[in-house]
């Protein structure tokens, strides 16, 4: 079966290249040390940028750092002038502007709140994300600059998938949200219960208990999603849940269980939800999915074609509204 599906949402992050060596100034460790110095530098207290269109350019106050604020899982964005429909662009701000915005909201900028996203050595820029969910007044503070926090799903839907730059921004925002939400749900050690602290610029966490020191890495939850078809390629099985908007349909999908292969998960989920028996399972592609529940912010969707062996549908009403 030939299908032109070459673009994957949240994939193709341009700043997630090979991790630089620790001695490289753009590595997480070196960049964090430089960040600490700048956090203590009073020259960061400059005037905020007045025009949102300049937020993606280098700032004279901290030309080698750009910060993307998030509030309750939503990235800071702006919509360009003259656009008939909202086309959201990431609201990057300088480190100096970030300090000013937070100070105006009574929030102390802490090292632990920042997460390293990546770098572009050619542009002499290191990118960070920060969770500002505790700043209740930040929405109006950024709103005065024509910036707003938008749900990542909304950004995804509004993104032009033929625009490589827009898709790259979507991938960066997805990576940032996944890391920040993982930090939010990993505040305590699962082994001893003590608090965890970020390490390597937020790439991992470690238990603060000196007798434990368990290292915790971002968890990835694998999900199978399958297009169930017949051998003649003239029938396809789609489903809908009660929470879907009208006329919205989806492929069957579900989480992989312990001790289960990807192919087994495809067959089990299809059978459990629709009563359809699946034979051959053919891999298609995969993509990150950082817009799931906050408790599982780092999902990986693995896509398959699944060839049906039976055709009598028996819908699980607890899972689906219909097929």
Residue spans for each PLM region:
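N-terminal alpha-helical interaction blocks
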Residues: 2-165
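Unchanged
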Residues: 105-161, 249, 254-323
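Short, intrinsically disordered, charge-biased short linear motifs at domain edges
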Residues: 172-180, 190-198
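Residues immediately within or flanking Cys/His clusters that coordinate Zn2+
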Residues: 183-186, 193, 204
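Basic (Lys/Arg-enriched) interaction patch that binds polyanionic ligands
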Residues: 191, 197, 209, 265-273
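Secondary-structure boundary elements
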Residues: 193-199, 229-234, 273-277
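N-terminal strand-loop-strand
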Residues: 201-251, 283-284, 306
